């Protein structure tokens, strides 16, 4: 949904959302065609899942909302059931995003890499400042608003934090009940 991002994560396979191309946001028309394609090729499958990710999907927030609305309309017409999910770095999360996602997203993935020093090292803004202090309070509020269910605080762990069990424990100490661990090899 977004070939763009507001962070410069050191291990990003999407090259700050560019995917080895140019920065761009998916149009509503392209997203609509993708949902139509999914419906047309789903056969007798009733349950369909769409994950909004990027880059950072909240950089294209209006299109996310519009595509969810379109998907909900199509459910009735085609006897389908969409399960929408969202993966975010949290920078643009606000009350409106939380409220909408709590209503419409079957799951949200909150990207946080554990302890402050690890997260800020691996997930900085483009100019180098850390993002931990901005995103952690939002993610804590969001997890509580989802009754500690149907979300994951997902840590991406690298050679930089081989003691990642400390990061998992830190996430638990922050109050997260749903924790996911994704290993990766980072260049630095």
Locations of regions flagged by a protein language model:
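Short, surface-exposed alpha-helical recognition segments that flank or form part
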Residues: 22-26, 58-59, 130
């Amino acid at each position: 949904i977004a070939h763009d991002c507001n962070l410069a994560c050191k291990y990003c396979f999407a090259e700050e959302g560019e995917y080895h191309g140019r920065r761009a946001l998916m149009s509503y028309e392209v997203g609509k065609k993708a949902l139509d394609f999914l419906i047309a090729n789903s056969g007798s499958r009733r349950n369909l899942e769409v994950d909004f990710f990027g880059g950072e999907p909240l950089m294209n927030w209006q299109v996310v909302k519009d595509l969810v609305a379109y998907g909900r309309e199509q459910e009735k017409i085609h006897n389908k059931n969409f399960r929408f999910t969202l993966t975010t770095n949290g920078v643009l999360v606000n009350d409106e995003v939380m409220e909408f996602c709590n209503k419409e997203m079957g799951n949200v993935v909150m990207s946080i890499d554990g302890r402050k020093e690890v997260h800020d090292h691996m997930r900085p803004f483009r100019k180098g400042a850390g993002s931990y202090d901005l995103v952690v309070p939002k993610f804590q509020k969001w997890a509580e608003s989802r009754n500690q269910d149907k979300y994951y605080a997902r840590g991406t762990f690298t050679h930089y934090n081989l003691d990642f069990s400390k990061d998992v424990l830190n996430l638990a100490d922050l109050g997260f009940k749903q924790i996911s661990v994704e290993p990766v090899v980072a260049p630095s």
